[in-house]
From Swiss-Prot:
Listed InterPro entries: CheD-like_sf, Chemorcpt_Glu_NH3ase_CheD, Cytotoxic_necrot_fac-like_cat
Function: Probably deamidates glutamine residues to glutamate on methyl-accepting chemotaxis receptors (MCPs), playing an important role in chemotaxis.
Reactions the enzyme catalyzes: L-glutaminyl-[protein] + H2O = L-glutamyl-[protein] + NH4(+)
NCBIfam families: PRK13497.1
UniProt similarity note: Belongs to the CheD family.
Sample GO molecular function, one term: protein-glutamine glutaminase activity
Protein name per UniProt: Probable chemoreceptor glutamine deamidase CheD
Name of the top EC class for this enzyme: hydrolase
CDD domains: CheD
GO BP term, pick one: chemotaxis
EC number, as in UniProt: 3.5.1.44
Keywords of this entry: Chemotaxis, Hydrolase
Pfam (any one): CheD
Length: 184
């Protein structure tokens, strides 16, 4: 039996991913225009989450080579992390969250992020069993990686603006990103 109050919380920030098999663990993040992909293998009892800022990859000169901000890199790392923990690709299922239009501009990076995640998963043959994307406000997300349960809380306008400010800052320095990705 999973007791919600006894949950071990693991917070994910922009540019990170985590893979867990602890049934009492809950992954959490706060999203504005960023997207979180939540994947799991229900048979292996393992799941994970990533949090990316931009769709595509870090191939443009403007990217500064920071692959951890980009969807392609974090999606591959999450899938590979799940496979290393015993998941099988043919059993993976996904839920997608975020992608709000938090700034009034001509470009809608949130919509692009959500579309990228959906297309990536479609191309990989991973079914999306749930999603909540778009809108004008951010959201706080909680995801139980073993059960696949997800819960989100809408953010107020002020909370959304704080989230936007955080998303526009460079990602926190981390250990060097894995530069090789194994494609299956």
């Amino acid at each position: 039996m999973i007791v919600e109050g006894a949950a071990r919380r693991v917070h994910i920030i922009q540019g990170e991913y985590k893979v867990l098999s602890d049934p009492n663990a809950v992954l959490s993040t706060i999203l504005g225009s960023c997207v979180a992909a939540c994947l799991r293998d229900p048979v292996a009892g393992v799941g994970g989450m990533n949090h990316f800022l931009l769709p595509g990859s870090a191939t443009s000169p403007a990217s500064g080579g920071d692959a951890t901000r980009y969807g392609v890199h974090l999606m591959e790392l999450l899938i590979n992390g799940l496979l290393k923990q015993g998941a099988r690709r043919d059993r993976l299922e996904a839920k997608i969250f975020g992608g709000a239009k938090t700034i009034s501009t001509f470009s809608n990076v949130g919509e692009q992020n959500a579309a990228f995640a959906m297309q990536f998963l479609r191309d990989e043959g991973i079914p999306v069993v749930g999603s909540s994307t778009g809108g004008e406000h951010g959201r706080k997300l909680e995801y139980w990686p073993v059960s696949g349960r997800a819960r989100q809380y809408p953010l107020t306008g002020a909370e959304t603006q704080r989230t936007v400010a955080l998303e526009q800052r460079p990602a926190a320095p981390q250990k060097p990103a894995e530069t090789s990705i194994e494609f299956f």
